[in-house]
Amino acid sequence: MDLTKFLGQDSQEQSAQRLSKEEYAAQKKQEREEIWGMIDGKAQEVFQNGDSLKGFLDFMGQCKPQRTDNLFLLYAQNPEIRQVKTFEKWKEEGKVVKTGSKGYNFIVGQEYEKDGVIQQGYSIQKAYDISQIRTKQPEEAEPKPMDQLMEALLTDSEVRIQIADNLPDKVQAQYIPNKRTIYVRNGMSENATFHSISRELACASLDHHDGSYSRAGVSAQAYCAAYV
């Protein structure tokens, strides 16, 4: 029985207090090495081929926003995870973890002071998916009409989006950095239009306006961002 679902981190901290300082440090060091080994292993697996990358991007789309290392860590433990929070965070929301639920390893950022300076660190804690919580489970969102999606995509765009009839063959849309404009072919299917504009908006967001922009350099990130 995992008592952390009833007692949170308190029992773990009390257990740690029974270890010597050296034993506790060694235990935590081993824990961190195992966690980062899991993250590195999953990252290498994800980028092996297109299918494995697609699976990870699908996971990113279903999972509530997380830092990248947590995404790899959670994906390695259960690709069905949708929304995770620590025991304490669920408790703050008045939610209860289901009996028998096993927590997932989870990286939690935290601040600490060293030599009078605030530093950024992290700890390894247990987190629980919403499927493990006694609450009404979220329903899958109904697909929105394409017109509504397109309007949301184009609203408040930081770059101009303009129809162009002279794009090269097989080019659906293209971001031109020195003009801060996305040129898009008219008359494509709804899906092709939406995804091509999404991709070029992602390219534009990766342009730092310092002359370093390279289409080849941002393509992979842009395609992934647009897919998600």
Q: What do the predicted segments below correspond to?
A:
Residues 1-228:
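N-terminal accessory/interface modules of nucleic-acid-binding and processing proteins
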